[in-house]
Structure formats: C-alpha cells, structure tokens
Amino acid sequence: MQPDFLILGCLLCIVLVLQILALLRRSDHTALDHVLREEHRVGRAELREQLETLERQQEVRLASFARSLTDLVARIDQRLDQLTASLGEDARKGRQEASEGQQRFADALGQRLTELTQRNAQSINEMRTTLEQQLHVLRADNAQQLEQIRAIVDEKLQTTLNTRLDSSFKLVSERLEQVQRGLGEMQQLATGVGDLKRVLTHVKSRGTWGEVQLDNILDQTLTQEQYARGVRVCPDASEIVDFAVRLPGRGQYEAPVWLPIDVKCPKEDYERLLDAQEQADQELVRTMGVQLERAIKIQAKSIRDKYIVPPHTTDFAVMFLPTEGLYAETIRRPGLADVLQREYRVVVAGPTTVTALLNSLQMGFRTLAIEQRSSEVWSLLGAVKSEFGKFAGILEKAEKQINTVGKSLGEAGRKTRTIERRLRGVESLSQEQTQVLLDGLDVDAAESDVDSDASF
C-alpha cells in the first residue's frame, strides 16, 4: 500500500506546483491567495477521502487475510489430526503384524520341533521294528534250515550231514555276530554320548576335559623339561596347580621359577548368559553377565591366593578357559581383563591365546639357551685359539723343513747340471751296451759280496 500513497502524494504535489505557477502569473495577489487556499482545502479533502478509501480497503484485505489464515490453520489442524490418527493406526497395525509374525514363527518352530520329535520317534520305532523283523526272519530261517537239516539227516550220509551242519552253523554264527556287532556299536555310541554329556555337565569332568585340552597344547608347544603337571609351587604349602611352566632361575644351580597355569570353566554361568541373550531379555542379560564376572573374579582370587607365591613362582598366573566362546565373552566384558590383571595378577587365556603365549615363552627359552651356551662357545673358541697357535708353530717347522728339502734338492740339481757339463765330451753308449755293462756291474758286485762273505 505504500507505493499507492507515494504516487498520490507526488500527483498532489505536482498539481499544487502547477496551480502555484499559474497563480504567480496573475498580478492580483489577493485572488492568488484565495485560489491557493481553495485549492489547498480541496486537495486536503481529496487526500482525506483517498486515505479513508485506502484504509477501508486495507481493513477489508486484512479481514479477508485473517479469514484465509483461520481457514488454513483449521485445515492444517485437521490434516495433523488425520496424520496422527493414520500414524497411530499404522503403528498399531505394525505392532499387530509383528506380534502375529512372531506368533506364527513360534507356532511354526514349535510345529517343526514337534514334527522332528515325531519323526525321530518314528525312525527309532521303524529301526526297532526292522530289527525285530530281521531277528524274526533270522529265527525263521534258522528254524527252516534246522528242519531241512533234520530231513537231510535221514536221507544223506554222516559226512554230508556234518558238512551241512558246519555250513548252517557257520551262517548262523556269522549272522548272529553281525547282529551282535551292530547292537554293540549302537550300545557303544549311546555310551559315548552319555559319557560326553556327563563330561560337559559335571564340574569335575569339565575340569578334567579342560586339563586334557591344555595338556595337549603344552605337549605340542613345549618340551617335557619345560613344563610339569600337578606342581606344588610352594614347598611349605599343599596347594597343587594343574600345570606350571618351568622358568630357569637367575643362576645355573638355583631352583626354577614356576609360571602357574590353572584350568577354570564356569560353564553354568556362561550357559545362563547365552540363554538370556537368546531370550532377548536385556535385564536378564545384564544380571547373568554380572554373575559371570563374579564367578570369573572368584576363580581369579582363588588362583592368586593359592598359586602366586614369589619367589617360587612368577608374580602373575594364567587362567585357562577351555572354550573360545567363554574366553571371548570374558574379554568382551568392559574392564574385566584389566581388573583381573591389576587386582588379582591373573592373565586370562583361551585355546588360541595360550598357544601364542607358550610360543613366546618358547622363543624366550631358545634365547636363554643361546645365552647359556655362549660361554661354552667362547671357551671352545679359546681352546681353538690355543690349538691354532700350536698349529702355527707346526706350520713354521714344516715350512723350515720344506725350505731345507728345497735347498737340498736345489743343491742336487746344481751338482747334476755340473756333472752333465763335465760329461758332455764323453760318448754315450747304446741301450744294449748300457744294459750289458750294467749287468756286468751287477755280477761283479755279487761276486765281491760272496768273496767278502767267504773271507769272513
């Protein structure tokens, strides 16, 4: 609305200016004043009317805008109510569908388990029925063969009867042996399953199973001299740790220092935690997690109080958890591993990490062995140095002797060349003449030897 006011104001100013200019041209000032007053009054009246008109228009527009705004707010409220109702209905339907889906899944799972149980029972019944039928057929077959044997006894000779009897009894024994073998395998399988169940449910058996597992790992990683089973780490106490790694003392003849490794398996607390996680009950999961932490801390405190006795042992011990799941859950608990190391001086290890720990100890053993053998190597090098000095003296003597022999050979060579120079003027004999002459010299030498012997 402001541009309209500006335009009207400009027009009024222009009209006033034109009227003033027109009146200035007149010579009568009184008439000019009268005209100016009249024009000014008329202009003010027109301006007032225009302002009132604009005010009325503005009020009409504001009223229309207020009505439009009220309608818009009402429509928005209505749409919001509809949207809220629609979202609530969708959420209710979603919850209902999720509940129905979970119920269907639970029903399907229960039905599946029921079918599986019925199928297993049916399979067992079928196996029992088949076995009974085979035994019945076997009995009938045996009875039939016995009847045939009785009939043949009357018809055949004793030798034929014996042959048939041997054959029949052999067949019967083989089949009975097969049946007995099958029953024995089934009984052995059932016994093995029962033993495994007792091992996994009985606390002492679980400990024995963990000890066997740790024993296998130690046997594959270290030598028999580097660890021991059932070690009494403190001579003044009766506590015996499951396993201990033998660390060498500071001196060569000092007693070894033991690194205790004890097997712990709080399986019940861990299984209760797994059941709570499967039920998706956060409060129960938290409670079972706290119980598992408490059980681990109790075992760590027991290890600290029983097996950590410096200087007979190291100032820490190793708690071996025989399953990777239990070890991972223990490490996953916030701050539990730090508390065990700081307060109880216990390091938690699983089947994989204990292997890495033992490998690092094995490298330490090798380094220590190299350090211990370095003095022996140094002594051996000293002995080699002494012998090498003697060998150097022998080489010097040999060199002198070789030089002496070389000088003798050189002197002989010079004398030989001197004799050759002096004999250059002597005529050489043929090979036959030389041989005859040498033979004659040999005969003369032999005769002279005989004469000398005779004279004696």
Curated annotation (Swiss-Prot):
Keywords: Coiled coil, DNA recombination. The keyword Nucleotide-binding does not apply. Residues 36-60, 106-158 form a coiled coil. InterPro entries: DNA_recombination_RmuC. It comes from the Bacteria. Pfam families: RmuC (PF02646). GO terms for biological process: DNA recombination. Involved in DNA recombination. Belongs to the RmuC family. This is DNA recombination protein RmuC homolog. It comes from Xylella fastidiosa (strain 9a5c). The gene is rmuC.
